[in-house]
């Protein structure tokens, strides 16, 4: 394990942390290239908390309270989203998955309302299915609904078309696979 990167916190004194800040900048630049997004944030705890923060961010962007959350998202990610939003006015509606293991996109389109803030999916999802969401993204943008895509396995971004190029508005992920395995 690399001891100098033992924390997810961004250093507060840039004058004594140039090396760490440079590493974070390089990481964010690479994340932008892999996700197809214009900007990236670092220093979230993990992919699950990043997804929860993305849901809260979507609400702040469009002031809507309904979220359609795919049941094909990793259960631990969904649990963290539920924990973060408990006690708020957020309405998390579970979207079923199909027999093929993908999110039921027809269900999403049928249940989309003017108060739907975002649709939340994971690709590849918990079952390993690469979601087909380009046409969904186009439909959502007409409604002003955001598309949040979670990427639990960052290495997949090396072979899949970036979520940003497929219509995702917000992309979150887990960066563990870029480093060493957990060592405790």
Which stretches of residues belong to each language-model region?
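Conserved N-terminal alpha-helix of the aminotransferase class I/II PLP-enzyme fold
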Residues: 2-50
């Amino acid at each position: 394990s690399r001891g100098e990167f033992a924390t997810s916190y961004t250093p507060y004194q840039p004058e004594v942390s140039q090396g760490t800040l440079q590493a974070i900048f390089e990481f964010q630049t690479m994340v932008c290239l892999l996700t197809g997004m214009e900007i990236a944030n670092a220093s979230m705890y993990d992919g699950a908390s990043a997804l929860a923060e993305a849901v809260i961010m979507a609400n702040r962007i469009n002031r809507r309270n309904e979220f359609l959350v795919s049941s094909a998202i990793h259960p631990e990610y969904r649990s963290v989203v539920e924990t973060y939003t408990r006690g708020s006015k957020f309405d998390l509606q579970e979207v079923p998955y199909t027999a093929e293991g993908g999110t039921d996109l027809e269900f999403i389109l049928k249940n989309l309302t003017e108060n739907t803030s975002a649709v939340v999916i994971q690709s590849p999802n918990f079952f390993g299915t690469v979601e087909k969401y380009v046409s969904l993204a186009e439909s959502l943008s007409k409604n002003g609904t955001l598309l949040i895509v979670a990427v639990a396995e960052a290495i997949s971004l090396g072979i899949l078309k970036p979520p940003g190029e497929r219509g995702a508005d917000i992309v979150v992920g887990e960066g563990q696979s870029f480093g060493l395995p957990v060592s405790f």
